[in-house]
Amino acid sequence: MQTSSSGYILALDLGTTGNRAFIFNNAGKIVAQAYKELTQHYPQPGWLEHDAEEIWQDTCWVMKTAIANAQISPSEIAAIGLTVQRETCLLWDKTTGKPLHKAIVWQDRRTAPLCHQLQEKGYAQEIYSRTGLVVDAYFSATKLRWLLDYITGVDLKNVLAGTIDTWILWKLTGGKVHATDHSNASRTMLMNLKTGEWDEQLLEILQIPAHILPQIQPSLGKFGLTDTSLLDTAIPITAILGDQQAALFGHGCDRPGLMKCTYGTGSFLVAHTGSNIVRSQHQLISTIAWTQYNSQENINIGYALEGSMFTSGACIQWLRDGIKLIKTAAETETMANQVDDNGGVYFVPAFSGLGAPYWDMNARGAFFGITASVQPQHLVRAVLEAIAYQVLEVVQAINASCSSPMQRLIVDGGACENNFLMQFQADVLGIPVERPTMRDTTVQGAAFAAGLAVGFWDSYTALVNQRQIDRIFEPGEGSQNAIYNFATWQKAVKRSLDWV
């Protein structure tokens, strides 16, 4: 597995709710880590912003803290891998290095009216054909258009644009490298899925100047060196992946028939489709899994089908911080088990509209079926059940789009800690749910990719074969009721559509 007898890999995971750094040793094990929670800015209902300067400062802090915790020298780090929240984007001044506005987050819905305009003008099919994506405020393109409209009196020759990976790479390299990888670029609604390049026609439709966009490079490759002023040494940055693609890589899902679901702020079910673009008739999106050079220095492209569900872990966070029904996320498991059923209550997790398979920017969240006998436990259980029902809908869509049905679901992310949720997920799917011992698969994927790209490890298969399974949840006695109630949940969803 290893070609390096000593040294370490630094992996950065810059997510929606926080930023993390991990140090991996040559055995592929985590030896140290650091975390910083990220401030969420809600300037208006349906809007969500992040301070890009805060992300950069936190990145510096978690890197230095993780290195200190590992008690190693930065010069011992062989490479850096970077994985990020996708679609979130910003503009910055390349002279001052300062953002021109806060970054607009993937959950932000402010550009829904612009998306409706694109649909009304008949661009939806053209955009899907070229990018594999549906027209939605989720993706970066309309966010960038909004930012360009918002900033006035700025010389565009001085402006750079990018997703979070591009911003952090530019800062890490001291402003020397303005680049992104195919997995992140494929989420902008501006990259041609077949060519792997920015699509000139889409840039024209959205009036986005090509010169402000980063160069697109393979996910595993050479992204430059860290500026020596940062860690007193120049460290190669050798992998960049979107967070869901990094998890796919970390699980070893590198060929058709393998898929995973990450339960984070949202739930994201991704199935590798090999070197072929698979088009779904069921509102799933086609995207890049990851890219890398082969031995002939040609680019190998791996594609994927994805079902993006915008709100899952965010529901649990809302139960805690929004309506203060719980004090900790862990309480939800205990509370859900305190009642025999959902008490007739169904929850629709549409805080930011609905993603796959509905793609309704105007849907909103709701509880249905509340009576005077309903207890807090029923509400909590309804929220957990809704997370699982969303995944069921996407699994059904993937099964209908692929030649053979899914045999098992591999899971990761914070909410997969919840045993009630995982058992209910197995019950509704009717297939085993496999939870690995290593929960941080996203950052593991970034580390593996960076190490393989620099020759720190020589075998992807050997790394993946180290995976250990914590628990397999088999469909149980609750399956019949769970499946029966699914139809009622779907009825609740239909009543939430096109709400605003």
Swiss-Prot record:
This protein's name: Glycerol kinase
UniProt binding sites for ATP: T16, T17, T265, G313, Q317, G414
Reactions catalysed: glycerol + ATP = sn-glycerol 3-phosphate + ADP + H(+)
GO molecular function, one term: ATP binding
Pathway(s) this gene product operates in, as recorded in its UniProt entry: Polyol metabolism; glycerol degradation via glycerol kinase pathway; sn-glycerol 3-phosphate from glycerol: step 1/1
Binding positions (sn-glycerol 3-phosphate): T16, R86, E87, Y138, D243
Described function: Key enzyme in the regulation of glycerol uptake and metabolism. Catalyzes the phosphorylation of glycerol to yield sn-glycerol 3-phosphate.
Means of activity regulation: Inhibited by fructose 1,6-bisphosphate (FBP).
Residue sites binding ADP per the record: T16, R20, T265, G313, G414, N418
Sorted UniProt keywords: ATP-binding, Glycerol metabolism, Kinase, Nucleotide-binding, Transferase
Pfam families from the UniProt entry: FGGY_C, FGGY_N
Binding site for glycerol: R86, E87, Y138, D243, Q244
GO biological process: glycerol catabolic process; glycerol metabolic process; glycerol-3-phosphate metabolic process
EC number(s) stated in the UniProt entry for this protein: 2.7.1.30
Family the UniProt entry places it in: Belongs to the FGGY kinase family.
Entry annotated with the keyword Cell membrane: no
InterPro entries: ATPase_NBD (IPR043129), Carb_kinase_FGGY (IPR000577), Carb_kinase_FGGY_CS (IPR018483), FGGY_C (IPR018485), FGGY_N (IPR018484), Glycerol_kin (IPR005999)
Gene Ontology CC terms, in alphabetical order: cytosol
Gene3D superfamilies reported in the protein's UniProt record: 3.30.420.40
